[in-house]
Every structure is written in C-alpha cells, then in structure tokens.
Design a protein with these regions (language model features):
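Sec-dependent N-terminal signal peptides
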Residues: 4-13
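Solvent-exposed loop/turn segments at secondary-structure junctions
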Residues: 90-94, 120-125, 172-175, 197-201, ...
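Conserved small/polar residues in nucleotide/adenosyl-binding loops
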Residues: 282-284
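N-terminal cap/lid segment of alpha/beta-hydrolase-fold proteins
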Residues: 31-76
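Serine-hydrolase catalytic machinery in alpha/beta-hydrolase-like enzymes
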Residues: 61-75, 79-167, 177-180, 184
Length: 284
C-alpha cells in the first residue's frame, strides 16, 4: 500500500549518551522572578546514527526543573549574538533522548546557534513526562509556559543570545508545545516547527499569535497523532493538520492556495510525500 506523507523525514537512531569532566558554573544572573538555575558543565558523547557526536553541555537545575544548554564550538561572549532554539521532547520522553535523535548539536556547530533542551515534568494524573497544552485532558496543574518562558528569559540574560531570533522545534507533544508557545508568548518566538505534533483544542481556540512562521511535518497515516485530529465529546483533544495549517495561513496572511511539490519515493519502499508552502503576503 502506498503511504503518503506531508514531508519525508529521516530521524537518527537513538542509542545512548555518556558524560565526563564535570565542573560547576556559579556566576549566573537571576531573573527578577527569582529563577536562577545552577548549572554544571560536562563533556558529553551523544550516540546517534551513524556515529557518536561529542560536545560540551551545561546541565541546569532548579529545585524541581531541569534543562540543558548546548553552545556551538565557536561560541563567544563578545561580538555578534547567536540565534537560539528550544528542542522539545515528546510525551513520556526525555531531553537526553531528544538530544540523541535530533542532531541539533552538530547543526549548531556548523551554523552557529544555541540549543536548549528542556525536560518536561510527569503528568499529575496520566503519568509520563510531558508538556501541558491540555490535549491529553484535565487534572494537570503543570505550567509549561511559565517554565519555558523563564528558561528563555534566563538564557537570554546569561548568554550572548539574540532574543529576536528565538525558535522552538518539537517532536509529538513537543510539537504541540511549540505551537502553544507561539500562541502564548508570541512576541518572544520567531518561528516554530512541529514533527508529528498538532494544536490542542485549547491552544487552537485560545491562540492569540502574531504572524509567526511555522513548519509542520506529519504522516498522513499516523495512528498516535492522527492527521485528521481527534476530539472527545467533552471537547478535549487536538485539531486535524489541515485545520492547523488553515489557521496559521490565515493568521500569517498567506496565499490561500499553497505551492505544492511532490516528494519522490527515494527509499523505494512505497512511501512518498507532498511539500506544501503557504507564502505570507507580509514580512514576518
């Protein structure tokens, strides 16, 4: 059977992560809110396909939250500031796992940007690490927006980062959260990318975003986050991908009809794809 995808994406294989050479960083500046994580610097070997990648990570902890910061090899506190991005893991996953399959560390070294890998908390009633965008139901007081905005503000204050070029990319639930950030702290997010994510009904119905570039990568036969979405009788769930693209096309004042490019079956396994681009009529 021929399977059709919006975009054909090859993800790296997750194998593991090692670390050595710990040192403490203690000269960070706290936010006015009191957010001031303590960071440890260590050399990490991230095992991804086809070969391990080595780099220096900063693991930052508050009393109940954690995130990692990766600075490019040529990072400097003087001179031009660096763009930065969140890389958000999926439901039940971890920041370290996300670090392994995304390959952003290598890309950061090549293209000079900073990557932040935050760690989600366990859902209070469902279990499993997550980002709270309400797509998996009520009974959850975790404030993911507050945490991620604090991390964004803190790294902007403590590293040479251009806060006018801050982005978010996420896998599955991390994709949901990237949309949620674009809706809730819209002035701080330049663009987002979602891989197999969507928008929760709550995000969709309450989104107050300024024009923001988005990229969605999704399988049309995805059974975990179905392409057509799913909403319960109580209104909990997430929107279909066509609805999400229509929302952002309108929000960004884009052409009604996208340009469409067929993607070839380069693996000869019956899987093809379609690339759709909605161009904005304004400068974003």
């Amino acid at each position: 059977m021929n399977k059709s995808f919006l975009l054909l994406v090859f993800l790296s294989i997750v194998l593991g992560c090692g670390e050595s050479s710990n040192s403490n960083d203690s000269n960070s500046t706290a936010l006015e809110t009191g957010f001031n994580p303590k960071c440890t610097t260590y050399n990490a070997t991230i095992t991804i396909y086809p070969s391990p990648y080595e780099g220096t990570l900063r693991r930052c902890n508050t009393s109940d939250r954690q995130f990692y910061v990766y600075l490019p090899e040529d990072y400097s506190e003087v001179g031009s500031s660096y763009p930065a991005m969140f890389s958000l893991h999926g439901y039940t996953s971890t920041a370290l796992t996300n670090m392994s399959y995304t390959g952003f560390m290598k890309q950061a070294d090549i293209n000079d940007f900073v990557v932040i890998y935050p760690q989600g908390l366990v859902h209070e009633t469902k279990g499993g690490t997550h980002w709270n965008t309400d797509e998996i139901g009520p009974g959850n007081s975790v404030n993911s927006i507050e945490f991620l905005e604090s991390v964004l503000d803190w790294v902007g204050q403590n590293y040479n980062i251009d806060l006018n070029r801050f982005y978010s990319a996420g896998m599955s639930n991390g994709g949901f959260m990237s949309y949620h950030l674009a809706c809730n702290i819209t002035s701080k997010i330049s663009a987002i990318a979602s891989v197999t994510g969507s928008m929760s009904v709550f995000s969709y119905d309450n989104c107050n975003a300024q024009p923001t570039s988005v990229m969605q990568i999704h399988g049309s036969v995805d059974t975990v986050v179905p392409y057509d979405g799913t909403v319960s009788a109580s209104g909990v769930g997430f929107k279909g991908i066509e609805d999400v693209m229509e929302f952002w096309s309108s929000n960004n004042i884009c052409n009604i009809e996208p340009s469409i490019e067929a993607l070839p079956d380069i693996s000869a396994n019956g899987v093809s794809g379609t690339h759709r681009i909605y161009l904005s009529l304004i400068h974003i």
